[in-house]
C-alpha cells in the first residue's frame, strides 16, 4: 500500500473516503482493504481512475463490485467535498478579501458561494433521489415515475463554474493580489476540478 501512495500522492485524497488512514506499515493493498472491510476491486479501480488521465472505465469493470460499496464510496466523496475541499477553497478566497482588492475578492466570494450552492443541490438530488432508487433496484423495488435515464439527463456538469472561476483568477484579478495567496487558491481549484471530473466518471458508469 505504501508503494501505491509513493507512486501517486493524489491518492492521499482518496484514502479517507474508504476509511483508510496512514500508518499501515508494510501491509499490502489486500491486507489493508481486508482490515477496513473495503472492496479491493473498487479501491484499485478508483486508484486507476485517480492515477491515469487516459484511464476510462467501462461498465464491465464495475460488474464484479457490490453496488452498495460503490454508492457508499460516492456518498463518502460527497461528504469529503462538502466538508473539506470546498471549505478549503472558500477559506482561500476569504484570505484574498483581506488584501488590497477587497471588491474583486468579494465578487469571487459570491461567485463561489453560488457554485457551492449548486454543488450542494446536485449532491442532495443524488442522495435523496438517485441513491435510494439504486438501492431499491438492488432489492427488487422499482420506484414509479422515475428512471435512471432521468439521472443521466439531470447529471449536470458542475465543473463548468469551476472553469469560469479559474478564468477569473488567471485573467481578470488586478496585479495587486498577493501572488502566493492567489496561486494557492488557483491550485486548489485545479485539484478540485480534477477530482470532481474523476468522481463523475464513476457516477456515469
Walk through the language-model features, giving the residues of each.
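Small-residue-biased structural context
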Residues: 1-205
Amino acid at each position: 500500500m505504501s508503494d501505491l501512495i509513493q507512486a501517486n500522492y493524489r491518492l492521499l485524497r482518496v484514502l479517507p473516503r474508504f476509511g483508510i488512514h496512514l500508518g499501515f506499515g508494510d501491509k499490502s493493498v489486500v491486507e489493508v482493504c481486508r482490515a477496513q472491510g473495503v472492496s479491493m476491486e473498487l479501491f484499485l479501480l478508483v486508484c486507476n481512475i485517480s492515477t491515469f488521465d487516459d484511464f476510462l472505465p467501462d461498465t464491465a469493470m464495475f460488474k464484479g463490485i457490490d453496488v452498495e460499496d460503490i454508492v457508499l464510496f460516492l456518498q463518502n466523496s460527497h461528504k469529503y467535498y462538502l466538508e473539506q475541499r470546498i471549505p478549503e477553497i472558500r477559506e482561500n478566497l476569504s484570505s484574498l478579501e483581506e488584501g488590497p482588492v477587497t471588491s474583486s475578492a468579494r465578487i469571487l466570494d459570491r461567485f463561489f458561494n453560488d457554485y457551492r450552492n449548486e454543488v450542494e443541490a446536485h449532491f442532495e438530488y443524488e442522495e435523496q433521489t438517485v441513491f435510494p432508487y439504486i438501492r431499491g433496484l438492488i432489492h427488487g423495488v422499482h420506484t414509479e415515475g422515475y428512471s435512471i435515464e432521468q439521472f443521466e439527463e439531470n447529471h449536470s456538469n458542475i465543473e463548468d463554474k469551476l472553469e469560469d472561476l479559474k478564468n477569473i483568477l488567471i485573467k481578470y484579478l488586478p496585479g495587486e493580489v498577493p501572488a502566493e495567496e492567489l496561486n494557492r487558491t488557483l491550485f486548489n481549484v485545479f485539484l478540485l476540478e480534477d477530482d470532481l471530473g474523476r468522481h463523475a466518471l464513476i457516477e456515469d458508469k
